[in-house]
Design a protein with these regions (language model features):
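Active-site phosphate/pyrophosphate-binding segments
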Residues: 136, 140-217
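N-terminal export/assembly segments and adjacent metallocofactor-ligating motifs
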Residues: 1-163, 172
Length: 217
């Protein structure tokens, strides 16, 4: 291939779409699973203009458990959406939300919360097995195996909901910070386990997290 400008690419794509429309040819839009209502609207608009368009979703790392959990709780098969600019305390359990987790796009909101205001900025605690982009930016990074992460998530739930005291001192501190933050706290998880996903949703509901809005999914 050769170098091309975005204008060249757009012209070529538009011409190809119009040609497919005229001939009744199929058009495929391939994406990963995304928690982006605005992108969904754009794809719906494209499909309306070019009726033979099919939207195919493929994930190199499956998001099916997150989708299943959300559907079980809210009746809609979608991914939860998060606005990290509204969070004072962020606890991530195995979710690289500054990378390509759930299609990415969370970095802008996160960056807003990391700008000091009146001497305060959001607190970010990352629990993970391998270093990630989110982990590299965290205030506190807690290395744990996947099994330990699941236990940590359960401990956070019981601490927030019933006031139980986690045995792990770092998790106990994270739980206290979440409880103190109340609706300004949020928990996300990238664990490939439907029960873990359900627990994360339950914690955010218990906190009445402002950063988590199911209706935006």
């Amino acid at each position: 291939g050769k170098d091309a400008t975005w204008a060249d690419v757009n012209t070529k794509v538009k011409a190809s779409l119009e040609d497919a429309k005229a001939k009744g040819g199929n058009v495929v839009v391939l994406t990963n699973t995304m928690a982006s209502p605005s992108t969904d609207v754009l794809i719906a608009s494209l499909t309306a203009k070019y009726p033979t368009t099919k939207h195919v979703v493929y994930d190199a790392v499956s998001e099916s458990n997150a989708l299943d959990a959300f559907q079980a709780v809210y009746g809609v098969r979608a991914l939860a959406n998060y606005d990290f600019s509204k969070a004072d305390v962020i606890v991530s359990v195995g979710a690289d939300f500054l990378g390509d987790w759930q299609g990415g796009g969370f970095d802008a909101g996160y960056a807003q919360g990391r700008i000091p205001k009146n001497g305060m900025m959001s607190k970010h605690i990352q629990i993970e097995s391998n270093m990630s982009l989110a982990g590299a930016n965290a205030d506190v990074r807690i290395p744990m195996t996947v099994a330990q992460q699941k236990q940590a998530l359960a401990d956070l739930y019981y601490a927030v909901v019933s006031g139980a005291q986690p045995k792990n001192t770092q998790i106990a501190k994270a739980a206290k910070q979440l409880k103190d933050a109340k609706s300004k706290g949020v928990v996300v998880t990238g664990l490939d386990d439907v029960n873990a996903q359900l627990v994360a949703l339950a914690i955010n509901n218990a906190l009445q997290s402002e950063a988590f809005n199911p209706s935006d999914a």
